[in-house]
């Protein structure tokens, strides 16, 4: 199995994705030519805070303004992501009013993520529609590059199973649940492995709000 051509959805296909795609296709063709059974697989990141960021920006400022062309729409989604990050980024010497506005925007974005995570029908539908816009562009780019995927895996398909695994790790004492104290679910890697020279490696496996990581 060769895994490649897997950009995040709601972001336009760019030169970095092209490099990865061409390299992956070259490796797939070489293994196939050498006589090996070859499966071309893509694992797009179609979930996470970056995806929710675009949904929030669209819903709040740009709903119904999307262009109709496949590639124009994909590039437009990327612009929404950039604009959203400008609004959400803390500015140097920002005024109290600007701080309050930025924090309000951040709270709205987090609330949308919470709603998605809780299965809110309207947020899930918006996610499905915009996700398909991004995938339409990706499929067309792959067609242009003469790349044909055999299987598609999506991050959203492993979101719920991964939460179940986290709960299992907590139950087994491998992960520490610090959410009651305002923290996240973490694994203290050095402590669990009995390493003494390095004591600072900690892996966050679930955010404090219960959402998963990339």
Protein language model regions, located:
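NTP-dependent nucleotidyl-transfer catalytic core
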Residues: 1-214
């Amino acid at each position: 199995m060769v895994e490649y051509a897997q950009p995040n959805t709601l972001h336009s296909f760019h030169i970095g994705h092209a490099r990865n795609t061409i390299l992956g296709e070259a490796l797939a063709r070489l293994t196939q030519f050498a006589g090996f059974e070859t499966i071309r697989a893509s694992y797009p990141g179609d979930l996470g805070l970056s995806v929710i960021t675009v949904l929030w920006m669209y819903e709040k400022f740009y709903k119904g303004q999307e262009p109709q062309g496949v590639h124009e729409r994909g590039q437009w989604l990327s612009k929404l992501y950039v604009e959203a990050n400008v609004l959400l980024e803390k500015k140097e010497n920002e005024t109290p009013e600007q701080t309050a506005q930025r924090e309000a925007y951040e709270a709205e974005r987090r609330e949308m993520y919470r709603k998605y995570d809780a299965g809110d029908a309207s947020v899930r539908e918006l996610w499905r529609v915009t996700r398909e816009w991004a995938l339409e562009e990706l499929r067309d780019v792959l067609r242009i590059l003469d790349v044909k995927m055999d299987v598609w895996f999506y991050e959203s398909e492993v979101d719920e199973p991964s939460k179940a695994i986290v709960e299992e790790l907590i139950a087994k004492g491998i992960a520490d649940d610090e959410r009651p104290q305002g923290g996240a679910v973490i694994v203290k890697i050095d402590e669990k492995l009995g390493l003494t020279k390095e004591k600072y490696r900690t892996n966050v496996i679930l955010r404090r709000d219960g959402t998963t990581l990339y």
